[in-house]
């Protein structure tokens, strides 16, 4: 069973960072200095566990353009088990409760675009490349 919590302890934050390290740096070859950034201290972080094992992470932060969802990561062995869906639902629930009038957006990696479309996001603008990975900006329409 999947459980998603808002990170409140250093231990949970370390677990989220470890998941991001495995997915983005090791698996996708994103430079480590690009994966961790200056927004870590202001972002709201989330950690997913599956049967008690940390397996997914995400964060969101306020920007001048609205609320940006970022760093969604699920370990390979836990994909296709609705972990990503549970993280997204938890994050959206918190974001919409705290910021009902703000636009919610994210930059989706190409393989994840259809996942986000199924959950109420629409593409905006042209495809772009960040850290050698193709992305689309997507806006939450609900």
Enumerate the predicted regions with their spans.
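Conserved acetyl-CoA-binding loop of GNAT-fold acetyltransferases
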Residues: 117-127
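Conserved GNAT acetyl-CoA-binding A-motif
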Residues: 95-108
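Short acidic/glycine-enriched loop/turn segments that link adjacent beta-strands
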Residues: 40-42, 65, 130-134
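Conserved beta-strand in the GNAT
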Residues: 47, 53-61, 68-73
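C-terminal "cap" of GNAT-fold acetyltransferases
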Residues: 109, 129-142
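Conserved acetyl-CoA pyrophosphate-binding loop and the N-cap/start of the following alpha-helix
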Residues: 78, 82-90
């Amino acid at each position: 069973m999947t459980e998603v919590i808002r990170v409140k302890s250093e231990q949970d934050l370390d677990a989220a960072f470890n998941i991001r390290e495995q997915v983005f740096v090791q698996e996708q070859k994103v430079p480590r200095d690009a994966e961790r950034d200056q927004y870590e201290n202001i972002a709201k972080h989330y950690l997913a566990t599956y049967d008690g094992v940390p397996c997914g992470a995400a964060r969101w932060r306020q920007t001048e353009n609205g609320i940006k969802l970022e760093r969604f990561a699920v370990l390979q062995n836990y994909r296709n088990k609705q972990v990503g869906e549970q993280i997204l639902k938890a994050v959206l629930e918190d974001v919409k409760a705290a910021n009902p009038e703000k636009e919610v957006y994210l930059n989706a990696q190409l393989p994840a675009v259809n996942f986000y479309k199924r959950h109420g996001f629409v593409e905006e603008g042209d495809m772009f490349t960040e850290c050698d990975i193709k992305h689309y900006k997507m806006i939450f329409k609900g």
